[in-house]
Amino acid sequence: MVASAHMSVLTASVAGVPRIIASAPPVNGEPHPAIVAAMHMGGAHEIYVMGGIQAVGAMAIGTETIEPVHMLVGPGNAFVAEAKRQLYGRVGIDLFAGPTETMVIVDHTVDAELCATDLLGQAEHGYNSPAAMITCSEKLAQDTMIEIERILKILPTSETASASWENYGDMILCDTHEEMLGVANDMAYEHVQIMTDRDDWYLENMHSYGALFLGPRTNVANGDKVIGTNHTLPTKKAGRYTGGLWVGKFLKTHSYQRIETDEAAQLVGEYGSRLCILEGFVGHAEQCNVRVRRYGGKNIPYGEAAE
C-alpha cells in the first residue's frame, strides 16, 4: 500500500535513522510506481522489489547483496507477522500485528448509512477482519443491520467484507454510555470511531485502543491514509499496554555514570556494600568495598558490609 510507505519510511526518516531500506512486491511483474515514489520521497535509501517472508528474512538476516537491518516495521499478511514474531530478538519490530480491527461507538446522533459504511470499509481488508458496533440505540442497531445488507449487494469487495462481517462482526447493544465505554475498553480494538453526543468524554475516558477517530466527519480511511497519525497500530487487545508506531520507536536511550571524587566513591560505595550484602551478593559488595578501601581509607573485612 502506498500509505504504508509514508507511515513507516517517513517515520523512520523523521527519527533520523541513518539507513532505511524498503520493499514492496511487484504488481503485474513490475515495480509499482506510486509505491516506489512514496518510498523514495519518504526517505528510503535502498528500495527492493520483493515482498512476503522472503523480504522480511532478507532484511533481518541479510543476503549477499543486502546488509541486515536492526529493526523491521510495516504491515503484512499472517505469514509476514509470524516471520517478524520469530525474528524478534534478533531484530527489533514495531509490534505483533494481527488482522485489522474496527469499532464504531455510536448513539442517536448518527445514521445507519455512516455506521454501516464505516464497518464494511474496514471489513474489506480481509476475511478475518473484526468489525464491531457498540450503541445504546436499538433502532440504530436494527437500521444498521439492514443498511449493511444493502451495501454488501453493491460493494465490489463484498465477498471479503461479508465473510468478515458474518464471522467476525459484532453488534453490541448497551443501556448507557458508561456501559458502552466499559465494553470498548475491554475489547481494546485497533481503530475506534466515536460518533456520539459526548465524543470528548470518550476521549478522556478511553484507555485501551490503537487510535481514536472522533466525530462523524472523521473516519478510519482518512486517518490511515491522509490525516497523518500512524496506521501501524496494536491489535488483539495489545492496546491495553502499547501504542502504535511513532518516531520514538526508532530512538533508544543510553545511560552512563562517572564518580569523580574520593568522597563520592566512599559514600556511594558504603551504601552499595550494605545493599549487596543484604541481597547476598558478596562479589557485588566487593566491587563497592575495594573502592571504599582505596578512596575512603576504610579497612572493610573481605565479604562484609561497610558500616
Language-model regions, residue ranges each:
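A conserved active-site cap/scaffold subdomain adjacent to cofactor or substrate pockets
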Residues: 95-167, 171
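C-terminal core of ALDH-fold dehydrogenases
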Residues: 177, 185-307
